[in-house]
Amino acid sequence: MKEKDNFEMVINFKRAFMGRRNQRTKRAIKMIRNIVQRHFGAEKVIIDPLLAKSITYNGRDKIVRKVRVAVKKIGEKTYLVRLALKSE
């Protein structure tokens, strides 16, 4: 099986909207970590501050519904998650 070093994926935050409104950002960040750990077998997941800022650009309780992320392997079982930008 081919190693996943660079990968783009879309993460849907539908489950982050369940529960209290002021916990949405925390749940969304935790969802990103859990999804990357599950798909790549990562032990350490580093989230880019620009990605966290783009999730909450409307405020802490009004997060975006979906986000496209780029996952890059930077070490042994260590992954960096960044915001994937469209190239035109």
From Swiss-Prot:
A single Gene Ontology CC term: ribonucleoprotein complex
InterPro entries referenced in this protein's UniProt entry, alphabetically: Ribosomal_eL31, Ribosomal_eL31_dom_sf
Protein biosynthesis listed as a keyword: no
Gene3D superfamilies noted in UniProt: 3.10.440.10
SMART domains (alphabetical): Ribosomal_L31e
Keywords: Ribonucleoprotein, Ribosomal protein
GO BP terms: translation
Annotated transmembrane regions: none
GO molecular function, one term: structural constituent of ribosome
Any Pfam family: Ribosomal_L31e
Residues making up the signal peptide according to the UniProt record: none
Hydrolase is among the record's keywords: no
Family: Belongs to the eukaryotic ribosomal protein eL31 family.
Protein name, per record: Large ribosomal subunit protein eL31
Organism per entry: Sulfurisphaera tokodaii (strain DSM 16993 / JCM 10545 / NBRC 100140 / 7)
